[in-house]
Curated annotation (Swiss-Prot):
Pathway: Antibiotic biosynthesis
Nucleotide-binding among keywords: no
BP-aspect Gene Ontology terms: antibiotic biosynthetic process
Protein name listed in UniProt: Transcription factor sdnS
Biological role: Transcription factor; part of the gene cluster that mediates the biosynthesis of sordarin and hypoxysordarin, glycoside antibiotics with a unique tetracyclic diterpene aglycone structure. First, the geranylgeranyl diphosphate synthase sdnC constructs GGDP from farnesyl diphosphate and isopentenyl diphosphate. The diterpene cyclase sdnA then catalyzes the cyclization of GGDP to afford cycloaraneosene.
SMART domains: GAL4
Keywords tagged on the record: Antibiotic biosynthesis, DNA-binding, Metal-binding, Nucleus, Transcription, Transcription regulation, Zinc
Organism lineage string: Eukaryota, Fungi, Dikarya, Ascomycota, Pezizomycotina
Signal peptide: none
Subcellular location(s) per record: Nucleus
């Protein structure tokens, strides 16, 4: 090296800190600079990379003003930016559009018109991408915190994440939701028709307070009744539109027959319109997990169940309530949690959204009511909504209603109890609680309500609710004591149950008559029809038991005549509703009562002595055929052969298909049975298949019977006996005509939906149930 070069090199030397030994390349990479031997001039990392190893004592000739990005890294970042632009564009169209404008690739793609196939494939691929992202972007996952997608996926107009009612993201793309929303929006009547509809009934007042308390209504925490008349925007979430459509349908159920539907401007009749709406909502909303999982979706499930219950589809209603209950548990509303309860209606004040407690109570109330009627277990037995703390703001009627829900659950549990002694103890306990609840209301509250059917205010609704709550109370008493009504007359402990059933039945019927005289729409408050049917059958069956061994006096002739008139008026009301509404439920109920009314005729004839050869015409048994259950044969405790135990069932008759079973025995004498046959001879085969029949058999062997259904012997429990009372079943072969219908059959195919099966099962001490 020349002297000039050495001088220049010396000039380029830099002063470095003492102890600095790393080269420039290791410093840039922030790695430790190590040498293999003391005399090495190139460090090990530079040897591995093949780079120049220059000490920091010398100026770095390779230093560049700015570090150029790695080409592969730039490509990866570009793809990530493109993916993020597509993602945000799907979730937030406005924000996504802005981001897309900054992406050349995205802009170029937008200039082309994709084919339907490519759009579908792109949507499928994006849906799969969302699945992966949703699985990896939990609240505390590194990817979620790094990308910040949790906050970006929420519209700015929504509440903060700390809010109890923040919106819930959906796995479905907004484009699919938009298509669903458009389909639902097309079902609405014209906006100007809704005020006319809502003015014709008190439904809006009931619907807006369904999930709230009266105190919330007073404090303005509930939507007004007028809100039901407002159609949500077409871009609303599908559950928002579905909820309003179901509210409209329930209001239509309250319309009296003959209502002029022309102002509503709907296609077809009201039943046709409602069925179309319910079918569409079921297919597009309530059956899609990703859509229905919102607060409005939970409300829609309850409303759908109410509609089915009023329409007579008890089983579909039960299944819908059970779905709502399961979804509510997933949301945590049974634990009071609001984190997963997301409301998506941005046009409603968040303070007026339903509370978890209100939703949980209403779901349980509906589920238990339908479960009791169908003989099924309750979905949940949590009673947190009925604690003193939970009811401190409730009115007296609200407290009574919640107590009824609690006791309904206890009756369901009692019915599943196999120990007779334990079941009877539970029955006495429930009866005491019902009596205590009734006393707390005061005597004036129990007077029969009177309301003006033309009243357009909330007063009409209040009186209707009071009347229905009274009927519900007496209905629970009937179903509570029904298993003990036909027990052995010599057992005095059952006399109270017999008397309670008869008294409660009369109270139900006395309220049913004025109610159905004013509210003549068959689909309005359907449960009052079921209550009237149960009460009427109970009052009639009560006359079958003997009174000579019982401590309570037998009904006098005057009482029998009053009961006869009461049931006849009830039957006339049912027939009127059936004819004016073309309703199968009330028609079937009226026909059942017509079949059972001869019981009173037989009692009158026997007590009046209008019997020839009385000893040979004493009533031996009464046969009732229940659809899809079989023939129930009631035997009176008469002329028990000497040496035969009172707890021994009657020997089987010549019919090999007769199966002895537990029994609540009836006792009465009769003659003039020939009058039954002309009354029944005109019934058609199709009608017979759905109607119970009454058959009386004398000791002489004469009998008259109308075949109504068949029975599968595999559904029967083992032979048992209860308190010396007897009942058996007649086995009939399945002929393919009267087979059990589909479990989810509607009211058109299965009118009473198994309600009659539950009734006779309870009357028999709950030994005949076959699963609902």
């Amino acid at each position: 090296m020349t002297e000039q070069a050495q001088r220049e090199a010396e000039l380029k030397r830099r002063k470095v800190r003492k102890g600095t030994h790393s080269c420039w390349e290791c410093r840039r990479r922030k790695i430790r600079c190590q040498f293999g031997a003391g005399n090495d001039t190139v460090c090990l990392p530079c040897q591995a990379r093949g780079s120049t190893c220059r000490s920091q004592e010398y100026v770095d000739k390779d230093a560049r003003p700015s570090q150029q990005p790695d080409r592969r890294m730039a490509q990866r970042l570009g793809r990530l930016e493109e993916l993020m632009a597509r993602l945000v564009d799907r979730i937030l169209p406005e924000a996504g559009g802005q981001l897309a404008n900054r992406s050349t690739t995205q802009s170029n793609r937008g200039s082309r018109s994709p084919s339907p196939d490519s759009a579908q494939n792109e949507g499928l691929a994006f849906h799969q991408t969302l699945d992966v992202l949703e699985a990896s972007l939990g609240p505390n996952t590194p990817a979620g915190l790094l990308l910040g997608l949790r906050d970006a996926a929420q519209p700015a107009s929504m509440l903060t994440p700390e809010s109890d009612h923040s919106p819930a993201p959906s796995k479905l793309t907004p484009s699919r939701n938009s298509k669903t929303s458009r389909s639902l929006y097309a079902l609405f009547p014209p906006q100007e028709a809704l005020p006319v509809l809502m003015k014709a009934n008190a439904g809006p007042y009931y619907l807006t307070s369904l999930f709230s308390s009266f105190r919330d209504l007073i404090e303005g925490k509930v939507e007004t009744a007028n809100s039901v008349t407002v159609i949500p925007p077409a871009v609303s979430h599908p559950t928002v539109l579905a909820r309003r459509l179901l509210q409209i349908c329930i209001c239509m159920q309250q319309l009296n027959p003959g209502y002029d539907t022309s102002p509503l401007q709907i296609k077809g009749t009201i039943p046709e319109y409602m069925n179309n709406v319910v079918t569409t909502v079921t297919n597009l909303v309530t059956s899609i997990d990703e859509i229905v999982s919102t607060g409005e979706g939970l409300e829609s499930l309850v409303l759908l169940g109410l509609w089915h219950a009023n329409a007579g589809n008890l089983r579909k209603a039960w299944l819908t309530y059970r779905r709502a209950l399961s979804l509510g548990q997933l949301m945590g509303i049974d634990r009071g949690s609001t984190r997963a309860l997301k409301f998506v209606d941005t046009n409603t004040d968040p303070q007026k959204h339903s509370t978890p407690a209100g939703l949980w109570y209403r779901i349980n109330a509906c589920d238990r009511a339908s479960s009791l009627l169908l003989g099924l277990p309750a979905g949940d037995l949590d009673n947190s909504f009925a604690t003193e703390e939970a009811m401190k703001r409730d009115t007296a009627m609200e407290r009574l209603e919640k107590i009824h829900v609690v006791l309904t659950g206890r009756i369901i549990e009692r019915n599943a109890t196999r120990s007779s002694s334990e079941a009877y103890a539970v029955t006495q306990s429930i009866d005491s609680e019902l009596e205590r609840a009734a006393t707390s209301m005061g005597a004036d509250w129990w007077s029969e309500p009177d309301f003006d059917v033309t009243d357009e205010t909330g007063h009409k609704l209040g009186e209707m609710l009071r009347q229905m709550l009274q009927m519900r109370h007496f209905d629970l008493l009937i179903l509570l004591h029904l298993p003990y009504m036909l027990r052995d007359p010599s057992e005095n402990r059952y006399d109270y149950s017999k008397t309670t059933c008869a008294r409660s039945s009369r109270e139900v019927l006395k309220r049913f008559i004025p109610f159905r005289s004013k509210v003549t729409a068959a689909w309005a408050c359907r449960h009052v029809d079921y209550s009237a049917l149960v009460a009427s059958m109970t009052l009639l069956v009560g006359y079958l038991r003997q009174h000579q061994h019982a401590t309570e006096p037998a009904p006098t002739c005057k009482e029998r005549n009053e009961d006869r008139k009461l049931i006849e008026v009830v039957r006339e009301r049912m027939q009127h509703v059936a004819i004016t509404n073309r309703d199968k439920v009330t028609q079937e109920s009226a026909d059942i009562l017509g079949q059972m009314m001869p019981i009173l005729d037989l009692i009158d004839r026997s007590l009046m002595g209008d019997l020839s050869e009385c000893n040979s015409h004493v009533l031996k048994c009464l046969h009732l055929k229940v659809p899809y259950l079989g023939t129930i044969n009631f035997h009176p405790n008469v002329n028990v052969p000497e040496g035969q135990s009172a707890n021994t069932p009657y020997s089987r008759r010549d019919n090999a298909g007769t199966i002895p079973g537990p029994v609540s025995v009836a006792g009465a004498a009769t003659s003039g049975l020939e009058q039954l046959q002309p009354r029944m001879a005109g019934l058609s085969t199709a009608h017979d298949a759905a109607m119970p029949s009454v058959t009386a058999m004398s000791q002489g062997g004469d009998s008259m019977q109308v075949d109504m259904a068949t029975f599968d012997p595999a559904l029967l429990p083992p032979d048992t006996s209860i308190d010396g009372m007897y009942m058996d079943f007649d086995e009939q072969p399945q002929d393919g005509v009267h087979e059990i219908p589909d479990l989810m059959a509607g009211v058109e195919d299965w009118v009473l939906q198994g309600l009659d099966t539950t009734y006779w099962s309870l009357l028999n001490g709950n030994n005949m149930a076959w699963g609902g």
